[in-house]
């Protein structure tokens, strides 16, 4: 076998993109991502994540756009159009009312019809009607009773009948508890697929519990997606997307998305000497983990390097103190080395605690 490293662009976080309030920026980011997916030999990207930011403790808020349904739907639509302009499938998720990670596999979202229509569905409705995504991912949670993946009113009555969407549904990984109910509700593809699901669907089809016309419709939508893909069409991918052009997009959109909430005369800094406190000044958190994980890129600029590049002098004694502290924390947390990929966030270093004497000595 041949091993190859891939270096895709680290595009801006979704909430940064939404902070631009710019449809064209969303299109450019989506277009860049769609291009890289295509040129690296893939057909489908499982994004954008469009759940509303309703709780600041939600562990995947960095993947979402906003607490505003209109802004989320509009930016999401621009992103989807951009991705699919490159012939790559987008997959808006997690549909719907999947707004927390705590107990996410079994959480019951009890939502009134008015709140559902005006808040939780609205972002998806705008996105569907303005961009026509090829696929949509259903969520883990239950919605007013049944699991979202098994909710006929949600998947068929609202989205297909009312909104007129004709694309393919895919479940979140191992969502729901009844494969046949998911098929009957209108969910087309179950991921990642289990033997017990195959058997349940076959038995239900043979017994008549799962009508063939329903199964045929599910399969038809999957095939309609497949025949649009790069690989089905025999596209010869290059492994060389235009990373320089995409880096320019990141620079422009990242700058446009910066929001200064409060200044109080502190910025710009008057002096040129700075002292950095806090572990993440030296060991930054680049993003989420698990399903929403990001890897630290090979081409990064640390906070210290960035400050020095623009002429600031970073206080050296603190660098040494935090370097030693982080090394000790690494040994404490991972005595046998860091574990491989996990769906749970890695343990983080405890903050360095300074006594008054240590603090005075550090800043003298």
Describe every region a protein language model picked out.
Residues 1-364:
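Glycoside hydrolase catalytic-domain context in secreted enzymes
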């Amino acid at each position: 076998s041949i091993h190859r490293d891939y270096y895709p662009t680290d595009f801006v976080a979704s909430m940064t993109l939404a902070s631009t309030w710019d449809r064209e920026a969303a299109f450019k980011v989506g277009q860049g991502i769609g291009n890289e997916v295509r040129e690296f030999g893939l057909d489908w990207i499982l994004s954008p994540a469009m759940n509303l930011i309703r709780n600041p403790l939600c562990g995947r808020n960095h993947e979402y756009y906003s607490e505003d349904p209109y802004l989320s739907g509009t930016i999401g639509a621009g992103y989807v159009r951009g991705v699919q302009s490159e012939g790559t499938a987008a997959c808006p998720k997690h549909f719907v009312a999947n707004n927390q990670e705590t107990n996410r596999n079994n959480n019951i979202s009890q939502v009134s019809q008015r709140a559902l229509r005006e808040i939780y569905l609205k972002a998806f409705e705008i996105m569907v009607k303005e961009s026509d995504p090829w696929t949509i991912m259903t969520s883990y949670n239950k919605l007013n009773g049944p699991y979202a993946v098994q909710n006929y009113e949600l998947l068929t009555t609202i989205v297909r009948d009312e909104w007129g969407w004709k694309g393919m549904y895919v479940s979140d990984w191992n969502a729901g508890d009844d494969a046949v109910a998911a098929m009957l509700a209108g969910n087309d593809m179950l991921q990642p697929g289990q033997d017990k699901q195959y058997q349940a669907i076959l038995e239900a089809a043979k017994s008549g519990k799962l009508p063939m016309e329903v199964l045929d419709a599910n399969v038809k939508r999957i095939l309609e997606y497949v025949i649009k893909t790069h690989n089905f069409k025999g596209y010869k991918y290059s492994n060389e997307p235009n990373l320089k052009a995409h880096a320019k997009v990141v620079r422009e959109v990242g700058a446009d998305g910066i929001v200064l909430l409060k200044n109080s005369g502190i910025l710009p800094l008057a002096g040129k000497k700075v002292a950095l406190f806090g572990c993440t000044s030296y060991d930054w958190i680049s993003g989420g983990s698990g399903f929403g994980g990001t890897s630290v890129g090979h081409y990064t600029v640390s906070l210290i390097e960035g400050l020095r590049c623009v002429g600031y002098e970073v206080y050296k004694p603190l660098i040494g103190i935090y370097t030693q502290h982080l090394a000790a924390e690494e040994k404490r947390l991972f005595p046998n080395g860091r574990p491989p990929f996990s769906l749970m966030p890695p343990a983080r270093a405890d903050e360095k605690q300074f006594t008054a004497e240590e603090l005075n000595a550090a800043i003298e």
